[in-house]
Amino acid sequence: MTKRTLQGSKRKKIRVSGFRARMKTPCGRSILNSRRRKGRKKIMVS
């Protein structure tokens, strides 16, 4: 049987798309602001 393609890692996910990672770049901050404007319950993944 073939190996499953998605083998998620919590650490990798947070490093890529966590709150601190989003705050680092201007684009990431705009993502957070747009999610706040939309009224999302969760602003980021973690």
Swiss-Prot record:
Keyword annotations: Chloroplast, Plastid, Ribonucleoprotein, Ribosomal protein
Gene, per the UniProt record: rpl34
Entries under Pfam families matching the protein: Ribosomal_L34
Record's subcellular location: Plastid, Chloroplast
InterPro entries: Ribosomal_bL34, Ribosomal_bL34_CS
GO biological process: translation
GO cellular component terms listed in the entry, alphabetical order: chloroplast; ribonucleoprotein complex; ribosome
The organism's place on the tree of life at top rank: Eukaryota
Annotated PROSITE patterns: RIBOSOMAL_L34
Protein family according to the UniProt entry: Belongs to the bacterial ribosomal protein bL34 family.
Molecular function terms from GO: structural constituent of ribosome
The name this protein goes by in its record: Large ribosomal subunit protein bL34c
